[in-house]
Amino acid sequence: MNKSLTEKISAFIITKNESTRVARAINSVKNITDEVIVVDSESTDDTVAIAEKLGAKVVIKPWLGYVGQKSFAESLCVNDWVLNIDADEELSKELQDEIEYIFASHNQDRYLAYQIKLLIMHRNDQKPRMFAPFNKCTRLYNKKFASFANTVNSTTHDSVIFNKDVDFAGKIYLLNEAAYHYSGTSIEQLVTKANFYSNEQAKDLVKQGKKLSNFRLTTEMIWWFFKAFFIRRYFVFGVDGFVDSIIFAFARFLRLTKLRESSLKSKNVIASDYKERGNFMK
């Protein structure tokens, strides 16, 4: 852990059965942070042992949803400046150097938060491909002004939201260097994640009272395949990108079918209850 920076940084990572990837994530942040917090949702593999061996502070917490888990991990950080990465991500050496330079030169408070470019790394790749897709995410921020806990009406859309009284115009900076986001370890892992994540998303949609049209249900998978493969540029991964785009599109389709299933069950319960009351009144 880096003890030389005047303004300390806490890193936090949430995990569940990430024994094959958590070391890479921790090693990419431990040299630029004062502490690394790992909140583990009851892994059954060696995730906890690996994290502890690398010097991380591990806390076991039953699953609260993506937003709840990250909010809890954030609350454990002792420093105002916090850095969040997922277990399947890694800060490049260049990004580590950039962050360290900003904090060592006492320039971090010019902004309230920093965005990171997350380059998608296919599971079979050793280095980023040219024109690889990427996402821009706020991952380094001062938690006095922003937090994952500000996310409402969702347990899955985990993003850093500024406090309502904070004027953040011009106060977010996109870092020059990138981090790497590694895709699933296997087709099986991607499908398992798609099933789990679509369950969580469907629950959110039910809570939000979302309605579903037959048109959207029948076109959802086609649209999201097009978006993943062409707009998000998964075509740079060739056949593997084609396969992953189908799985991604299927996950989006699944969340709607599960929303529909939940809606039908609710209607059946209401109809059954109405029928029972009618029989009682006779």
Swiss-Prot record:
GO molecular function: glycosyltransferase activity
Coiled coil: none
SUPFAM superfamilies documented for this protein: Nucleotide-diphospho-sugar transferases (SSF53448)
Enzyme class: transferase
Keywords: Glycosyltransferase, Transferase
Signal peptide span: none
InterPro entries in the record: Glyco_trans_2-like (IPR001173), Nucleotide-diphossugar_trans (IPR029044)
Pfam family, one: Glycos_transf_2
Assigned EC number: 2.4.-.-
PANTHER family: GLYCOSYLTRANSFERASE (PTHR43630:SF2), POLY-BETA-1,6-N-ACETYL-D-GLUCOSAMINE SYNTHASE (PTHR43630)
Membership in a protein family: Belongs to the glycosyltransferase 2 family. WaaE/KdtX subfamily.
Identification of the protein by name: Uncharacterized glycosyltransferase RC0292
